[in-house]
Amino acid sequence: GRAGRYLNDGNFGITGDCKEINAEEVELLENHKFEEIRTLIWRNSNLNFNNASSLIKSLDERPNKDWLKKVHECEDEKVLKYFLKDLSGHKISDNKQVLSLLWECCQIPDFVKKTYGHHLEVVSKVFGFLNGKEKKVTNNYMKQQLSILNKLEGNVDSLSNRIANVRTWSYVSNKVNWVENQDYWVERTKLLEDKLSDRLHEELTKSFIDKRAS
C-alpha cells in the first residue's frame, strides 16, 4: 500500500502495447537525464496596438534566435483577423484601447469546438458589450445564457456540450470587469458546471454498466 511504499524498491511498468522499458532508460529516468531541448515555440508578446496593421505585424514578427521557432497562426489570431476584416458587423477603429480589448476578447478559449461560427458569435457578443454603452456583459444576458444551459436531461454528448458552454461563461465571468456582479456569476457558473459534471458522471457510469451487462 501507499503507506509502506518506501520499504521496497518500485519498478517501471507499461500499459497496452508499449515496448518494455530497458535498464538504460530506467537509469536516465531515475537520474533525470534527458535530451537537451533544442527548440522552443515562440510568439511575440510585445504587441503594437497603435493600429490594426501594426497589431497584425507585431503578431507576425519572427524570433531573432535560431533556437526559437515561431508558432503557427493560433486560433486567437484567426479570430482577430476575422474581426479586423470587418466581417463581424463591428466597426473596429484604430484606437489602442479598442484594439487591446478586441485582442483580449479574441483570446476567449473555444471550449465547445463544434462550430466555428458559434465561437465567433460568442466573441462578438462579449466584445459588443465591453465596447458598447454597457461596458460589461449584463446580468440579464448572463442569466439568459445560463438558463439555456441549466438542463440535466440528455445523453453524454449533450451534457458534455453544455459543460463546455458553461466553461466559456465561467471564463468570461472570471475576467476582471467583464461582467456585472462578477462574484455572483463566478459562483453561479461554478455551481452549474459542478451540477452538470455530476450528471455527466452518472450518465457515463450508466452507459458503462449497460455495455458490461450486454
Residue ranges with predicted function:
Residues R2-E30:
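Conserved segment of the helicase C-terminal RecA-like domain
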Residues E24-S214:
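C-terminal accessory/connector segments of nucleic-acid motor ATPases
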